[in-house]
């Protein structure tokens, strides 16, 4: 509903939606296609993909949409679609993981919708198991996401959580990967470089992992 509201009631500009992972991206992509097809009895041509033609533009017709998923498993060529310029009257909607926080910049992004969640690997040193968990973003990440809006003109950011949640639930910064991911490969790499004590080596990190994790 928010994507549709922005697309129909706000000035032109791409919409960037931050989601935790590929499952949520696909779900939103499918729901947007379905709702846009049905909305105001629009024809399927009102939702377009990268391969659709631009020849069917009509004056006073409902706005059309370019729906673009964006995540790290896409090829470089597929990721380029997020930077494509849509035709006049076409609203680009990029549905992305946190890859769009800092790694890339979508110049024509004017609107950001932030779900406030991220999916990341967490390691339990006691059980020696890893799991992929969905967690709240940090305030620093929320600020980064907010900064993606309005790179070339004033923009808007819609956070899908309350200011109370931001103040009381979100941490200032994300947990460093070295403190939440399994260290097996890293320890082996330290040995392969000729170091004999990975505990001493890792203790010199800016934010060293726990001794139990090592």
Q: Where is each model-derived feature located?
A:
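P-loop NTPase motor module signature
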Residues: 1-214
């Amino acid at each position: 509903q928010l994507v549709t509201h922005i697309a129909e009631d706000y000035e032109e500009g791409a919409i960037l939606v931050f989601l935790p992972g590929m499952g949520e991206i696909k779900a939103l992509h499918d729901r947007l296609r379905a709702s846009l097809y049905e909305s105001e009895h629009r024809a399927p041509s009102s939702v377009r993909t990268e391969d659709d033609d631009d020849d069917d533009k009509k004056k006073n017709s409902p706005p059309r949409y370019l729906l673009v998923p964006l995540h790290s498993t896409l090829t470089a060529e597929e990721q380029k679609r997020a930077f494509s310029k849509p035709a006049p009257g076409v609203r680009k909607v990029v549905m992305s993981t946190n890859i769009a926080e800092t790694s890339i910049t979508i110049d024509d992004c004017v609107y950001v919708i932030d779900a406030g969640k991220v999916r990341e690997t967490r390691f339990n040193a006691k059980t020696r198991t890893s799991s992929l968990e969905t967690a709240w973003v940090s305030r620093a990440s929320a600020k980064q996401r907010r900064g993606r809006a309005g790179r070339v003109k004033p923009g808007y950011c819609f956070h899908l959580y309350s200011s109370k949640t931001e103040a009381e639930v979100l941490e200032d910064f994300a947990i460093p990967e070295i403190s939440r991911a399994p260290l097996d490969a890293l320890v082996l790499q330290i040995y392969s470089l000729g170091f004999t004590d990975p505990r001493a080596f890792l203790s010199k990190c800016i934010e060293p992992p726990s001794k139990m994790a090592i």
